C-alpha cells in the first residue's frame, strides 16, 4: 500500500461529531457538548446522554451557542482530542 492510501484509511476512521459550543473562554480551545442518543434494548425508549469535550479552534471563530462539527485527532493536550472542522450554524 502506498502512503496516500494509508493516510486516507486513517482519516476515514476518525469520528466526526456534532454539538453545541458551551464555552469559548480558553485561547484556541472550545468546549462542545455532544449529545448521544441510544435506544433501550428491551423497552425501546430513546435515552439521551451528553458529554462535554474540548476541541481545538485555531482561528478562534466559534462562539457560545454555535452548532459545530468536530473531528477526532491525535491528542493535542491532556484532554483535547478533537479539532474544529466547520461551524454548521451560528448562534443568534
From Swiss-Prot:
GO cellular component entries: cytosolic small ribosomal subunit
Cell inner membrane recorded as keyword: no
CDD domains per record: Ribosomal_uS17 (cd00364)
Disulfide bridge positions per record: none
Keywords: Ribonucleoprotein, Ribosomal protein, RNA-binding, rRNA-binding
Keyword Transport: no
Any matching Pfam family: Ribosomal_S17
PROSITE patterns: RIBOSOMAL_S17 (PS00056)
GO biological process: translation
Role description: One of the primary rRNA binding proteins, it binds specifically to the 5'-end of 16S ribosomal RNA.
Similarity field: Belongs to the universal ribosomal protein uS17 family.
Subunit: Part of the 30S ribosomal subunit.
Protein name per its UniProtKB record: Small ribosomal subunit protein uS17
Organism annotation: Corynebacterium glutamicum (strain ATCC 13032 / DSM 20300 / JCM 1318 / BCRC 11384 / CCUG 27702 / LMG 3730 / NBRC 12168 / NCIMB 10025 / NRRL B-2784 / 534)
Amino acid at each position: 500500500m502506498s502512503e496516500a492510501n494509508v493516510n486516507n484509511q486513517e482519516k476515514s476512521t476518525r469520528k466526526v461529531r456534532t454539538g453545541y459550543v458551551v464555552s469559548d473562554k480558553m485561547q484556541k480551545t472550545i468546549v462542545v457538548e455532544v449529545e448521544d442518543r441510544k435506544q433501550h434494548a428491551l423497552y425501546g425508549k430513546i435515552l439521551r446522554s451528553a458529554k462535554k469535550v474540548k476541541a481545538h479552534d485555531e482561528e478562534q471563530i466559534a462562539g457560545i451557542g454555535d452548532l459545530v462539527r468536530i473531528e477526532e485527532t491525535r491528542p493535542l493536550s491532556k484532554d483535547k482530542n478533537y479539532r474544529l472542522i466547520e461551524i454548521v450554524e451560528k448562534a443568534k
